[in-house]
Amino acid sequence: MSEVTITGFRSRDVRFPTSLDKTGSDAMNAAGDYSAAYCILETDSAHSGHGMTFTIGRGNDIVCAAINHVADRLKGKKLSSLVADWGKTWRYLVNDSQLRWIGPEKGVIHLALGAVVNAVWDLWAKTLNKPVWRIVADMTPEEYVRCIDFRYITDAITPEEAVAMLREQEAGKAKRIEEALQNRAVPAYTTSAGWLGYGEDKMKQLLRETLAAGYRHFKVKVGGSVEEDRRRLGIAREILGFDKGNVLMVDANQVWSVPEAIDYMKQLSEYKPWFIEEPTSPDDIMGHKAIRDALKPYGIGVATGEMCQNRVMFKQLIMTGAIDICQIDACRLGGVNEVLAVLLMAKKYGVPIVPHSGGVGLPEYTQHLSTIDYVVVSGKLSVLEFVDHLHEHFLHPSVIKDGYYQTPTEAGYSVEMKPESMDKYEYPGKKGVSWWTTDEALPILNGEKI
């Protein structure tokens, strides 16, 4: 790897007006504008590093401001020194003695960290001419473990245990890499038909289309009312059937108390969902445990993680047996490094990884992480959410074929956005360039659509 120095950075506030057609609508977030708090690391080479954090509109500018503070700590640093001891670099980035006060390791500052750390990985991958997943797949167990800051999680897993676990997976790794290169490492599931704001006709149409496209796992948003959800799940089962190998999942996006979640899901149990996602507050470890215990006799699992702020919270969810499914988020956690730590804990305690991927840029990110989990860590096929929106704005968008993610082969982390898309949807943007300066944007800007 030739010597590369980070010379500067930029953040960009990019917002797509998805609230206009209710894409992404759920019981908690009725009308979000899918957004990227975007980070670009500039260098003295031909390469730049691109990372982003997903939000749903207002407040995206706050994350961009935080990105500037975190990225400033990289200015003047040589890439080779940053990646030589990734665990040390990660701790350096989270340990600014003043910035950590507004975390620590959670909230806006941690969202910003995710964007910046992922931009470093993107830059590193480009200099090596590899996709991010392949960098990790080519690591030795010791190199993988050196990417992680084990502070706060050694009661769950030690570096020595992690190396031993990864070494056990080495035997079949070459075969799994070959499967990845044949696009058979990451089966996809779809949420495209399940948004809460969609009408019956649109829901039926999208279910039929995704079924015909090879999907066998389908997620539906719930939490509006029991009656309406029973009607919508009835529509889903009418099309998918109960005994055709089609799996149904439901997602409440945190709207219920613990007793409400238990009662509500008992009333939906006849539709045989695999799991209920985010049934209550994402911070309530004991609440998730109570819900899981209550729903186990009904064959319904509990999934959460898209709002889980760091590896410490995941440690608690996993070690207490509060979840059946671990839903890592590529940029709510502190980038690739913290995800690698959670993959190890999930493997040790037998909890499958099903990443959160319902947002702009998230499928592009998580296809790498699910591939890493299968090839390097768990050795077991899982599924990964795919939301078929906004991929046209990326240089190397994620692609689904025959129900599988097509494993990325281009160098980088797949979230580099087209310059024209960033210009068109930058907020507040330049007059005559940004969509947000047009009359079309007024219903959102005036609060009529949100």
Curated annotation (Swiss-Prot):
Give the UniProt record's GO annotations in the biological process aspect: amino acid catabolic process; D-galacturonate catabolic process
Q: Which InterPro entries did the record assign?
A: Enolase-like_C_sf (IPR036849), Enolase-like_N (IPR029017), Enolase_C-like (IPR029065), L-fuconate_dehydratase (IPR034610), Mandel_Rmase/mucon_lact_enz_CS (IPR018110), Mandelate_racemase_C (IPR013342), RHMD-like (IPR046945)
Q: In which pathway does it act?
A: Carbohydrate acid metabolism
Cysteine pairings via disulfide bonds: none
Annotated active site residues, numbered on this chain, are 221, 356
Q: How is the cofactor bound?
A: Divalent metal ions. Magnesium seems to be the preferred ion.
Q: Which SUPFAM superfamilies match?
A: Enolase C-terminal domain-like, Enolase N-terminal domain-like
Q: Which family does it belong to?
A: Belongs to the mandelate racemase/muconate lactonizing enzyme family.
Q: What's the name of the protein?
A: L-galactonate dehydratase
Native organism taxonomy? Eukaryota, Fungi, Dikarya, Ascomycota, Pezizomycotina
